[in-house]
Amino acid sequence: MSRVGKYPVEVPSGVQVSIVDGIFVAKGKLGELKLPLSQHIEAEIADNKVSVRPVGTAAPARMMWGTTRALVASMVKGVSEGFSKTLEVTGTGYRAAVQGSNLVMNLGYSHDIVYAIPAGIKITTPRPTAIVVEGVDKQRVGQVALDIRSFRKPEPYKGKGVRYDTETIRRKEGKKK
């Protein structure tokens, strides 16, 4: 069983953390994030460290212990450094560009795909075949990247589609004559 929860979270300089009415708040140079704490969890701030511990030994308390610690750690990292995911667009004529507050993609359909960029997320296209999603909230950055990828998932025969830059596509051999 994992014991992630027992390790305290280091708070870097430039990040302010507080607990107000059962809500953990992290403020940094990139923004502010809030996390409502479960009733099964106690959090304590001391010496630039955040400690999380369960209330009692019930199963829900032990389950939320490590989860809450991981969420707090990602919040602290998000407001200080931020998170980013890079997507690659592969295919003949496939490209992406940011126009105003929309991401416009040509992915081989008869129409362009227009994706409205959500608040709190920054999307850039350093090249027509690369999309960079950045933000302070790890979950939202991952969800936006997944939404963009789902418009044209990579197919296994030619590898065309939108994929994460770290993702490897398992290729299949075409049919033989």
UniProtKB/Swiss-Prot annotation:
Family annotation (Pfam families)? Ribosomal_L6 (PF00347)
Q: Which UniProt keywords apply?
A: Ribonucleoprotein, Ribosomal protein, RNA-binding, rRNA-binding
Name a GO molecular-function annotation.
Answer: structural constituent of ribosome
PROSITE patterns, alphabetized:
RIBOSOMAL_L6_1 (PS00525)
Subunit structure, as described in the record:
Part of the 50S ribosomal subunit.
Job description of the protein: This protein binds to the 23S rRNA, and is important in its secondary structure. It is located near the subunit interface in the base of the L7/L12 stalk, and near the tRNA binding site of the peptidyltransferase center.
Q: What is the name of the protein in this document?
A: Large ribosomal subunit protein uL6
Source species:
Gluconacetobacter diazotrophicus (strain ATCC 49037 / DSM 5601 / CCUG 37298 / CIP 103539 / LMG 7603 / PAl5)
Gene encoding it? rplF
